[in-house]
């Protein structure tokens, strides 16, 4: 995964340098910010995306190239929407993890990318914009209690889908 980002930057940067600069937005994940046991490769790669973003911003900022990343939480795309329709209590369980009470949509991500590519963010580089409905800002102690209560109240919840 990091090789793809490296190669993309390697071949894009000469073109961006020859013009008026440009913008690169990498896709990381909240798993690059918070780690979960058993996901060593994925989470190491996403942490690497954040590091690579910062390094590229440092290296190529003087050339007028801004480099940022986004770190999405759970995003409800067509495939996952179909799976969650079969498992509404499981989806509610996941949605309850987010302080705003829902999972993200592709539009949430597109809006973040559009902002990072806009003039409104012209002084932002090397930043990872977390788009996660507040998941990464909450203390986990109360979150665990809330989720346990949900399972008690909804014993038929299927968490394997």
Question: Where are the language model's segments positioned?
Answer:
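C-terminal helical subdomain
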Residues: 3, 69, 89-120, 124, ...
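Active-site loop immediately N-terminal to the catalytic Tyr-X3-Lys motif
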Residues: 34-40, 62-63, 101, 119
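Alpha-helical segment proximal to the catalytic Tyr-Lys
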Residues: 14, 58-62, 122
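Residue(s) in the substrate-gating loop at a strand-loop-helix junction
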Residues: 29
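A glycine/serine/threonine-rich, flexible loop-to-helix segment
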Residues: 62, 73-98, 138-161
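A short hydrophobic alpha-helix cap/turn motif
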Residues: 17-18, 60-62, 75, 117
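Active-site helix of classical SDR
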Residues: 9, 45, 53
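Active-site loop-to-helix junction immediately N-terminal to the catalytic Tyr of the SDR YXXXK motif
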Residues: 35-44, 55, 79, 83, ...
């Amino acid at each position: 995964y990091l090789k793809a980002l490296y190669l993309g930057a390697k071949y894009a940067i000469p073109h961006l340098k020859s013009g008026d600069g440009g913008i690169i937005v990498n896709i990381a994940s909240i798993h690059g910010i918070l780690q979960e046991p058993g996901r060593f490769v994925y989470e190491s790669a996403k942490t690497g995306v954040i590091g690579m973003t910062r390094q590229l911003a440092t290296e190529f900022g003087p050339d007028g190239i801004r480099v940022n990343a986004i770190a999405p939480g759970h995003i409800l795309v067509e495939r996952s929407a179909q799976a969650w329709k079969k498992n509404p209590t499981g989806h509610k369980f996941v949605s309850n993890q987010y302080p705003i009470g829902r999972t993200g949509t592709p539009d949430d991500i597109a809006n973040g990318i559009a902002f990072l590519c806009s003039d409104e963010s012209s002084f932002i580089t090397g930043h990872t914009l977390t788009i996660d409905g507040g998941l990464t800002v909450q203390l986990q102690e109360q979150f665990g209690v809330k989720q346990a209560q949900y399972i008690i109240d909804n014993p038929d919840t299927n968490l394997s889908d």
